[in-house]
């Protein structure tokens, strides 16, 4: 194989080309590749952080949901206690009102009974006088014998 000037020229051109590529072409390509690697690494790291953040957010949401359920249960319990208190108060008020109405009714009945007794006593006194008049066949003066009538009314 003959080594001639063409081969040497090609060798020199190739070396110059390689040096040129290493000096001017290769660094931007390597820089772009390294930038792309860094971007991908940052994206993967961000993805991992986002996954961890999502997991933390889900745990926090679960904890808040549990807390909300506990609060809701306590609110429901408080409402039930309040309801029971209101019902008890209403029942107490109704009982007091019932007792008042019953007492009023009993007092009214007692008053009416006493009035009826008085009317009956008066009627009995009148009937007794009428009966005595018929028996004695004479009229008894009611004013003169009021003591006798009062005793008779008291006995009835």
UniProtKB/Swiss-Prot annotation:
Name of the protein in its database record: ATP synthase subunit b
Subcellular location(s) per record: Cell inner membrane
Cited function: F(1)F(0) ATP synthase produces ATP from ADP in the presence of a proton or sodium gradient. F-type ATPases consist of two structural domains, F(1) containing the extramembraneous catalytic core and F(0) containing the membrane proton channel, linked together by a central stalk and a peripheral stalk. During catalysis, ATP synthesis in the catalytic domain of F(1) is coupled via a rotary mechanism of the central stalk subunits to proton translocation.
A molecular-function term among this protein's GO annotations: proton-transporting ATPase activity, rotational mechanism
Taxonomic source organism: Colwellia psychrerythraea (strain 34H / ATCC BAA-681) (Vibrio psychroerythus)
UniProt keyword Hydrolase, yes or no: no
GO cellular component, one term: plasma membrane
Name of the gene this protein is made from: atpF
Pfam families per the UniProt record, alphabetical: ATP-synt_B (PF00430)
Subunit structure: F-type ATPases have 2 components, F(1) - the catalytic core - and F(0) - the membrane proton channel. F(1) has five subunits: alpha(3), beta(3), gamma(1), delta(1), epsilon(1). F(0) has three main subunits: a(1), b(2) and c(10-14). The alpha and beta chains form an alternating ring which encloses part of the gamma chain. F(1) is attached to F(0) by a central stalk formed by the gamma and epsilon chains, while a peripheral stalk is formed by the delta and b chains.
Segments traversing the membrane: 11-31
Bilayer topology annotation: Single-pass membrane protein
Classification via HAMAP family: ATP_synth_b_bprime
Keyword field: ATP synthesis, Cell inner membrane, Cell membrane, CF(0), Hydrogen ion transport, Ion transport, Membrane, Transmembrane, Transmembrane helix, Transport
